[in-house]
A protein has these predicted regions:
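Active-site and adjacent substrate-binding regions of carbohydrate-active enzymes
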Residues: 1-426, 434-456
Length: 456
């Protein structure tokens, strides 16, 4: 723990009131780390900690997540230069898991996290852990073997700890990290959900979202989805590939750029480049520049109600629940696009705006908090409850959740800026967001309205 932020004792105190997730950054190490300093100083035992490659090596087949050099030159203590593997940037140096010393050192880090009380272990950028020049160097068999090792160690040392893989890749590759349903991750990030919800909102058409959601399948009852809409990174576009045509992906990128979003690009093996990430707060991603605050909030609540209605475990990014807007000043000051959604606040700033019931922060925080509180009390929203998806025309998404005890929740979402009337849906129950009783076969939803109907 960085001394300026606290100590392990502070972490132990947090554990008393919350389940802790530790970010196990297993693919790479900071260029400012002690391990890398020892490597540069040529200290015995660190010779093979990082991956030195002849710059003449053909690495054209390697999957590149960013439009940056794969190899970065560094000067060692004796004056020699090594070109080291840097998948993401020159300040993140990839670890050499082919070295037994690295594997042992990283297992030691994992064991330390478990000892400090981690309930969840997030494996960061895990898909790139093993490198073989001439291959894509992503999703290799050896990488899956490493995850299986981490899972076996975790199960033996701290049974019940959940491993979550963070792989911002096309959906079919993402779900491979469940393994056989028992031997790799218990949860995977649901990376396709954030851009598909944006696609549905901006097109006012739920069909693609509904079709994809209806196809979701888990390999075992011991696995589930880690659902989210926003994070400290941008909104990944690779998870859309294979779900939407490339033309629709590029159309979404263009639309979001017009509304103020920034774009990060990746290099392709054929020399071209493609957009891989949209940088924007989710509040601004959902809205138009000229949207009223009321419409902005309504779209935002709709999207998060979808998140909270999906099978799996929902996660809400702090910038989202605080109703953050794009931080262009942060981008200019720090020099990278992801800063747009990483604004830092003082407690006083947040308190002032959350105590002003006319502020957009207050309205988003209070309404989203209410949704979360309602969800917690409903057994139909258990991660393992049955989920049935249906598109009613283009504009209405219907999700039915059925609990093990038979309780049913019907969620209706109007993905349009016009009132929509739903016919032929025989529903009897209570709408939980308004408290109104529902009966009959005809329902009218306002623009961007959500209904959670607990059936009698």
């Amino acid at each position: 723990v960085a001394p300026e932020t606290g100590s392990w004792q502070d972490v132990a105190e947090l554990k008393q009131s919350a389940s802790l997730m530790f970010d196990f950054v297993c693919n790479h190490m900071s260029a400012k780390s002690e391990w890398f300093a020892n490597y540069l100083a040529q200290k015995p035992g660190y010779e093979d900690f990082f991956i030195s490659v002849d710059p003449e090596t053909d690495l054209s087949a390697v999957t590149r997540p960013r439009a940056l050099p794969l190899l970065t030159p560094f000067t060692l203590n004796d004056g020699s230069v090594r070109h080291l593997w840097t998948t993401f940037s020159d300040d993140q140096i990839d670890l050499n898991f082919a070295s037994p010393q690295v594997l042992i050192a990283m297992v030691d880090v994992l064991l330390h996290y478990l000892m400090e009380g981690a309930r969840y272990i997030r494996l960061d950028a895990v898909g790139f852990m093993w490198k073989i020049p001439g291959t894509t160097c992503i999703h290799l068999e050896q990488t899956h073997c490493l995850i299986q090792l981490f899972r076996a160690i975790t199960d033996a040392v701290a049974p019940g700890t959940v491993i979550i893989t963070e792989t911002n890749v096309p959906h079919k590759d993402n779900v491979s990290y469940f393994g056989d349903g028992e031997n790799e991750a218990q949860m995977v990030y649901q990376f396709s959900l954030p851009p598909l919800v944006l696609h549905a909102v901006h097109r006012q058409d739920v069909k693609a979202l509904c079709r994809w959601a209806g196809s979701l399948a888990l390999p075992s009852t011991h696995t589930t989805w880690f659902n989210f809409l926003a994070s400290h990174d941008g909104i990944g576009l690779n998870p859309l590939r294979g779900i939407l045509p490339e033309s629709e992906i590029l159309s979404l990128v263009e639309k979001l750029q017009q509304e103020g979003a920034l774009v990060n690009w990746k290099n392709n093996p054929d020399g071209t480049r493609s957009p891989y990430e949209i940088n924007v707060t989710y509040l601004d991603a959902l809205s138009l520049r000229d949207s009223s605050d009321d419409e902005r909030i309504a779209r935002f609540i709709l999207a998060h109600a979808v998140l909270l209605s999906f099978p799996g475990v929902p996660a809400v990014y702090i910038q989202s629940i605080l109703g953050s807007r794009n931080d262009y000043e942060g981008v200019e000051r720090l020099g990278y696009n992801r800063a747009i959604n990483r604004k830092k606040y003082t407690a006083g700033q947040v308190d002032r705006e959350l105590n002003n019931n006319k502020s957009i922060r207050y309205q988003i925080y209070s309404r989203l908090s209410e949704l979360i509180a309602i969800r917690r009390g409903e057994s139909a929203f258990h991660p393992d409850s049955q989920a049935i998806f249906d598109a009613i025309g283009e504009h209405i998404l219907k999700i039915v959740r059925v609990a093990e005890n038979g309780e049913r929740m019907t969620a209706l979402f109007n993905f349009s800026n016009k009132m929509q009337t739903v016919y032929g849906q025989t529903l009897f129950g209570r709408e939980l967001l308004s408290g109104q009783d529902i009966s009959g076969t005809e329902l009218t939803l306002n623009p961007w309205q959500v209904m959670w109907i607990k059936e009698n």
